[in-house]
Every structure is written in C-alpha cells, then in structure tokens.
C-alpha cells in the first residue's frame, strides 16, 4: 500500500480527527479536543496526543518550549507538557498545524443526563444577560454522542468544538456549565473550560465501565427475543395515519391537553392524535409556527401529512416550523404520534397549543381523535428475556468518557438520577462505583466530585407518602457523606412541578460552586446546610440534632414545614416542628408515641425550609429505615 493510501485509511479509521498536510508531507492527526480555543488544566502535567505514520517525528511547540517525540509502530504518539501557569491566549504548534487561542486555567468534567445537557438557549428569557455575554475567558466543549457497549473508543465521534462565551458563540453552551464557569471565573479570574459529556434520558450505569459493574448482574443479549420485540413494537399507524385525507371518523375522541391515565388510555407504547381544522384566509399557503407545549415522552408531528418535527424525550418545548405551501384552504390537519413506553403519556396542561401565522392563529387545544399505534404489552413475553438489556451499562462510558481520559481536569460535576429514581435502592452503590471508576480512569484517587441532588418535581402531595425521588436524593446524600472529596448541592427549591428540566440553573450552579470553593479550592466556607445527626424521644415529641448547622439553625418563612412523624404503625402525618436550643422538636397530636420523623420526603418538597443561618437548606432525611 502506498504512503498516500495508508494516510487515507488512517484518516477513515480515526474519524473525528483534524488533519493537516499533503501528499508530500507528513499528516498529523489530533483528537478533536486538541483544537482552537481549547482550555488546558493549570498546575499539572499535560498530555498532548495524536496519530501519524509510524516513525513520524512530531514536535509540539508551546509557550516558548519544544517537545519532541516519534509515532510508534501503531502510529500513536504523545508528549507530556510540564505544569503550566494560568493565562492566555497562546498558540500551540504540532509540526505544521497551528492551534490558536489556547487558554490555561481550570477544567471541569460535566457528566449526567438531560439537566446537565440542557441547552442555554432555553434560558434566555429568564436570564437576559445570556445573549449579551462577552466572556472569552470561559470555554465549553460538548462531547459528541457515542454509545457502544462492545468496548472502549480511543477517540470521540465526529468533531467537537471549543466555544467561548461571547455573544456570537454562547448559544452553543449548556446552561449549568455556563453559570458554573461564570461563578469560577468571577471569583478566581483564571480561564475556565467546561468539558460536558452528557446525554438526556440515560441511566447512571451507562456511564460506568464494565470493570466497575462487576458487582451488578447482567443478562446475556438474546437475539431471538430482540427480533421478536421489534416486531411487536411495529407501529400500525406508520405511513398511514399521518395523511391529511385519512378517515379517522371511527376513532375515539379525547380532550387535549391531558394525561393518558385520566382519559382511560392504558398503553405502554404509542397513541396517534388527529385534529382537523379550518384556517383564516391570511394563513393559507404561508409559513407558520406550530406550538405543541410539552409532552411525555417522544412526539412526532405532521401537518397535512408533512413531517414538521420530533422531540425524543420529555421536557423540551415543542415548537415546529410549518413551511410555506403546507397549509391549504378548507380542512387542514395536525397529526401527533406520542410515544410513552412507561405508560405515562401526557400532553402537559398550561402550555401553548396553537398554530400561529403572522397575523392570525388557530387554537388547537380541545377535542382530538385518537387511536393506539402499538402497545408493548404484546412484547412482554419476550421482554422478560431482555429484562436488563436497557441497563446493560458502559456504552456511554466507552464512547464519551474513556476517549477524554487524557484531558486533565480540576474536578467533576455529576447531575443525573431522574432516570434511576424508580430503582433508587441501587443508586448509592452505582454512584460510588462511578466515582471510583472515573477516578481510576483519570489516575487521580482524590478527584473532587460535585454532585447535584435532584430538585423538586411533580405535583405536591397532600399527605406524607413514600417517594422514589426522595430515596434517590437520600442515596445521593449518602454518597456525599461516605465518599471522600465530594460535595452535594441541595436543590429541592430550584425545580418546577411540571417540568423535569427546570430553568433555574443559576441557583444550582451557585450551590455547586460553594462546594467547589470548599473541596476544590480549599476555602473555609459553609457549603452545606444542616445535616441530620440523631434523635431522641421525649413523651410525644422527637428531638432532632444536626451537624453542619454553621452559625445555627434557621428556617425560610414563619415556621418549619414538610416534617412528618409516625408511630409504630408507620403511618406518617404532617407534624409541627420548631427550633429550640439548636435542635428541632417535632410532634403531632395525632401521634401519641412517635418513633420516626421524615423531612422533605416527597417528590416535590419545595416548601421544606429548614436551613442554617447562611441560608443553606438541609438535605432531605428520615430517621427510620423502613
């Protein structure tokens, strides 16, 4: 094979790398992380790596120093740069390739699911400072999606890009990363890089290597069962029910918006909705905007048979463009295919459902026609053989964590748990494994981890009851107490009852930054609210004591809320709670002989208000182990 052909093959093999050179010169290949506007971690040895022809000599020039190496027999090479002082921008040269606008500062690895991935463009109305951001000293790199359970990947998929936080680039950021980077920069005045490796709707085990999942049983993949399940999930409406002229007169009717359960739809699969309507003449043939609120989980939307948009998971606002020429005189049609494999299909109330033109609009809420496309119950006999397939794990670690292992970081930020709330009992050991795994991958046993506790979500409960989200928060808290060099941001006041992706990422970032100031930067600062220590019973009262009360216990508002108390019957009722002598005294006239207390123990405990005098909320807790 000729030299040019060899280089072409290497270029195809290592997709996502940048190349420089020509037929007569050497081709140096770099991972997409090594590019313009990159941020390198200060104060530690730095690895710059890539690929070239075997035996090719490589010279890296940076800040007046030269580093030499040679590609090995597999074409791999790397150099180690000594610890660097913060600053920039600088140039880096790798042979003939020039990397511009390089900064040296602090880099944070951001992992998790959709709230870590939440795009900043959704927040511009709430935080008008975002579109006019002008900070070129903080940078953002979004790791391209890559999921592969077969084994680790040496390089990222596609080509990631570093973006600054200037007005022309800030919309490429994720929201939590932006606010956290801003906090760090404003205090320490060093460049900040946010390396975001996240994917919406993912389980924690997807982010853990196979080696660190050895204590969690796995099922073998059953190919026959996979094929049978695929056939059972084939949607009867595909290619037919979205047509404008389809006859839906035999379909049932339903009010939109609303939930499947309240309208009697008992399906774990897809439901097709259709609505016919007439237009104002001003909208015929013109471009329009279709507003379809929010839905659970996945929607595909058609107007007069033309596909106009899809969103793959619950949360994002559904706003779709309807091209000119689609809307016609007479009867028009909107068709919605809504898929919810867990049976919790929902078209969320109090959102906008309209078709808007330049001058007129059509209200779309009201009566629609509907029919079931498929119900995964038909696949259940086969799915039992694939019970653990969805939780097989490691695919995202292999594709989105392992390839960035050489990039030195200051700390990791983990925001995930929504997907695991239904299996909260195993979350603490999984999160412990993830932290140990990433620390081993980076070769840093004391790598700091900043954890986000799940915020409040879903409707408030009238009576105390158990909660998967509360148990998940408990698991996150336990890990933060049991695993060294971790800090927890309590956020049950920063969510939204009807949106799993709350907009207030600034509050979350500020609380994460308090933890960073303490465990990353070594400041003596209060970073935690009161932490339950113990209890004693006196008559019909339970007296609670706390650690980390700082300058003393306090509460937001006039009185403590969201305490529940129970006797031996384990039936919790809302309780009265008061702060006395640095402790909390809990009681209820309904419980004569109390044995247990719970605080902020619900999906949505937003009214819970126990804090210290620094204003930091207590983490939810319980005194029982029921």
PLM regions: where:
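Ser/Thr-rich low-complexity repeats and stalk/linker segments
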Residues: 27, 33-106, 342-344
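Beta-strand-rich ligand-recognition modules
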Residues: 64-87, 294, 301-354
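C-terminal beta-sandwich/jelly-roll accessory domains of carbohydrate-active enzymes
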Residues: 66, 549-626
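Aromatic-lined ligand-binding clefts that engage carbohydrates, nucleic acids, or primary amines
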Residues: 49, 251, 277, 281-305, ...
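An acidic-aromatic loop/edge-strand motif
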Residues: 97-164, 196-261, 331-398, 402-409
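Non-catalytic, glycine-rich low-complexity segments
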Residues: 24-54, 102-110, 117, 253-267, ...
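Short, aromatic- and glycine-rich surface loops/edge beta-strands on solvent-exposed regions
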Residues: 87-96, 333-336, 595-601
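Surface beta-strand/loop "capping" patches
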Residues: 41-44, 264-268, 278, 289, ...
């Amino acid at each position: 094979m000729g030299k040019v052909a060899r280089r072409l093959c290497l270029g195809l093999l290592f997709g996502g790398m940048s190349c420089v050179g020509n037929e007569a010169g050497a081709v140096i290949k770099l991972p997409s992380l090594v590019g313009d506007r990159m941020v390198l971690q200060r104060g530690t040895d730095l690895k710059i790596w890539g690929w070239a022809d075997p035996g090719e000599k490589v010279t890296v020039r940076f800040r007046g120093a030269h580093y030499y190496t040679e590609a090995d027999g597999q074409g791999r090479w790397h150099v180690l740069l000594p610890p660097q002082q913060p600053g920039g921008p600088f140039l880096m040269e790798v042979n003939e390739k020039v990397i511009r606008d390089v900064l040296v500062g602090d880099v944070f690895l951001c992992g998790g699911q959709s709230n870590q991935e939440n795009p900043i463009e959704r927040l511009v109305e709430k935080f008008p400072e975002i579109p006019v951001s002008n900070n070129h000293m903080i940078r953002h790199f979004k790791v391209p999606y890559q999921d592969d359970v077969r084994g680790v990947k040496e390089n990222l998929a596609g080509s990631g890009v570093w973006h600054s936080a200037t007005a022309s680039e800030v919309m490429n950021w994720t929201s939590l990363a932006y606010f956290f980077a801003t906090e760090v920069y404003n205090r320490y005045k060093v460049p900040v890089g946010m390396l975001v490796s996240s994917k919406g709707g993912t389980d924690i085990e997807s982010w853990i290597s196979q080696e660190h999942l050895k204590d969690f049983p796995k099922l073998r993949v059953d190919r026959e069962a996979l094929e049978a399940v695929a056939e059972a999930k084939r949607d009867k409406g595909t290619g037919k029910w979205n047509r404008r002229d389809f006859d839906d007169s035999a379909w049932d009717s339903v009010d939109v918006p609303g939930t499947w359960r309240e309208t009697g739809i008992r399906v774990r699969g897809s439901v097709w909705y259709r609505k016919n309507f007439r237009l104002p003449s001003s909208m015929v043939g013109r471009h329009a905007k279709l507003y379809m609120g929010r839905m659970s989980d996945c929607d595909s939307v058609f107007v007069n048979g033309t596909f106009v948009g899809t969103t793959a998971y619950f949360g994002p606002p559904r706003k779709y463009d309807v091209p000119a020429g689609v809307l016609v005189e007479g009867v028009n049609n909107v068709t919605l295919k809504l898929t919810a494999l867990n049976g919790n299909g929902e078209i969320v109330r109090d959102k906008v459902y309209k078709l808007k033109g330049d001058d007129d609009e059509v209200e779309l809420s009201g009566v629609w026609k509907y029919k079931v496309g498929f119900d995964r119950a038909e696949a259940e006999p086969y799915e039992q053989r694939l019970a653990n397939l969805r939780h097989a794990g490691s695919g995202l670690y292999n594709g989105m964590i392992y390839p960035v292992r050489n990039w030195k970081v200051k700390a990791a930020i983990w925001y995930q748990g929504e997907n695991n709330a239904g299996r909260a009992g195993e979350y603490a050991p999984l999160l412990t494994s993830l932290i140990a795994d990433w620390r081993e991958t980076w070769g840093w046993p004391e790598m700091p981890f900043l954890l986000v506790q799940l915020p409040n979500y879903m409707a408030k409960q009238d009576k105390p009851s158990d909660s998967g989200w509360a148990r998940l928060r408990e698991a996150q808290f336990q890990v933060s107490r049991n695993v060294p060099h971790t800090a927890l941001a309590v956020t049950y006041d920063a969510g939204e009852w009807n949106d799993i992706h709350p907009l207030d990422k600034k509050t979350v970032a500020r609380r994460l930054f308090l933890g960073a100031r303490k465990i990353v930067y070594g400041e003596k600062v209060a970073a935690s609210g009161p932490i339950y220590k113990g209890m004693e019973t006196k008559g019909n009262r339970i007296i609670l004591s706390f650690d980390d009360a700082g300058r003393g216990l306090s509460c937001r508002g006039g009185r403590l809320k969201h305490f529940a108390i129970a006797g031996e019957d384990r039936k919790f009722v809302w309780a009265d709670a008061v702060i006395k002598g640095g402790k909390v005294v809990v009681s209820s006239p309904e419980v004569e002989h109390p044995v247990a207390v719970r605080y902020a123990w619900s999906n949505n405990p937003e009214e819970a208000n126990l804090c210290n005098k620094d204003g930091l909320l207590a983490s939810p807790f319980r005194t029982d182990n029921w």
